[in-house]
C-alpha cells in the first residue's frame, strides 16, 4: 500500500514528535518514488485582543523563520530528497492541512498524534483527530515514542 502513496503530505511543528511522522512520510515518498510536501502553519490567534498592528510583522518574521527551519529540515532530516516541496502558510494547522491535501490531491497525510500544546489538544481536540475526521485521504498517525 505505501507504494501507492505517490503524493505524501506531512505537517510539522518542529518538535521531535513531528519529526517521527516526517520520517515515515519520507519513507512513503521514497517507496513510491513520489512527491513529499512538508508544511508548517503559523497559527493566527482569533481573539480580538490580539488585533494589534504588530501582528503582521510578527507573522512575517515567524513565516521567514519557519521557511529557514524547513530548509534546514530538508538537508538534515529529509536527506535532500529531490521531490520535496516546502510550504509555509498562516492558519490553523488541521484546517490548512485539509485544504492543502484537497488542493494537491495527496494520497496520504502523515502526522504526529499530538502537537506542541497538549493542553490545547485536550480542550479543543488534537490536529490528528481533526485530520482523521475530515481529511480527503488516509491519515497515518504516529504516536509519541514511536519512530
Predicted regions and their residues:
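General small-molecule cofactor/ligand-binding pocket signal
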Residues: 37-39, 85-89, 140
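Short, hinge-like loop/turn segments at secondary-structure boundaries
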Residues: 53-57, 103-104, 127-128
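Small/aliphatic-rich secondary-structure junction motif
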Residues: 2-53
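Structural beta-alpha unit
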Residues: 1-3, 75-109, 146-147
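Glycine-rich, Arg-bearing micro-motifs that act as flexible, cationic patches
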Residues: 108-130
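A short acidic, glycine-rich active-site loop
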Residues: 55-68
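Short secondary-structure boundary segments
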Residues: 40, 112-114, 143-144
Amino acid at each position: 500500500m505505501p507504494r501507492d502513496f505517490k503524493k505524501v503530505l506531512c505537517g510539522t511543528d518542529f518538535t521531535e514528535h513531528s519529526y517521527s511522522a516526517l520520517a515515515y512520510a519520507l519513507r512513503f515518498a521514497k517507496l513510491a518514488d513520489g512527491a513529499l510536501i512538508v508544511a508548517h502553519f503559523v497559527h493566527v490567534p482569533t481573539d480580538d485582543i490580539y488585533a494589534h498592528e504588530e501582528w503582521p510583522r510578527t507573522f512575517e518574521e515567524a513565516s521567514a523563520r519557519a521557511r529557514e527551519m524547513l530548509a534546514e529540515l530538508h538537508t538534515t532530516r529529509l536527506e535532500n530528497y529531490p521531490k520535496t516541496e516546502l510550504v509555509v502558510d498562516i492558519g490553523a494547522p488541521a484546517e490548512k492541512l485539509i485544504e492543502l491535501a484537497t488542493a494537491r490531491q495527496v494520497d496520504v497525510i502523515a502526522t504526529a498524534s499530538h502537537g506542541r500544546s497538549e493542553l490545547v489538544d485536550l480542550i479543543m481536540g488534537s490536529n490528528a483527530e481533526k485530520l482523521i475526521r475530515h481529511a480527503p485521504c488516509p491519515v497515518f498517525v504516529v504516536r509519541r515514542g514511536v519512530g
